[in-house]
Amino acid sequence: MDRFECWDAVEKRLNSLTSPESLSGLVFVEKVFEELGDPSRFPAIHIAGTNGKGSTAACLDSMLRAAGYKTALYTSPHLTCLGERLLIDGQMLGGEKWLDALERISVVLKKLPEVRLGYFQALTAAAFWLIEREKVDAAVIETGLGGRLDATNMLRRPLLSVITPLGMDHMHLLGNSLSEIA
């Protein structure tokens, strides 16, 4: 299978595991993480905000790598390939590793038939499972939509939380004021 076929297979597998965005908050994500052995215990820097999350995350990842740390960088969205969302020491993991992670998620979902995950929830569970196995010194994790129900809030050991400038985006989901959004 060539590179493009592999990433197409990863995307198809991910889509086969997801439902329309789950309204369960983190309840289903917590169940999946519990079955996975809680793959969210790695040391992390958690980044939220409206503007500048990706740039801030990339800069922090670069500084950590320059200082000799093994890093993971998890961002969204991707431009051309899902693998862009997770870099280990600045490099994409192979599609085969993502397929392994998604197979593990599939096994868990078969054990928990009541659980439905949205796309970002399943992707985050797979990414955290991969990060845990890569034994990084630090992970830089960018929120998705953000807010209290974001799947990246499953992090157990944030070393630092960073909030970049906030705007009034996604008010229907996150709140009607900057303090509610934050």
Go through the PLM ranges and name each one.
Residues 1-49, 56-58, 62-67, 74, ...:
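Short functional linear segments
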Residues 26, 30-40, 66-156, 168-182:
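ATP-dependent carboxylate-amine ligase catalytic core
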Residues 46, 87, 162:
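Conserved beta-strand segments that form the floor/walls of ligand-binding pockets within enzyme
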Residues 160-167:
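Conserved beta-strand/loop subsegment of P-loop NTPase cores
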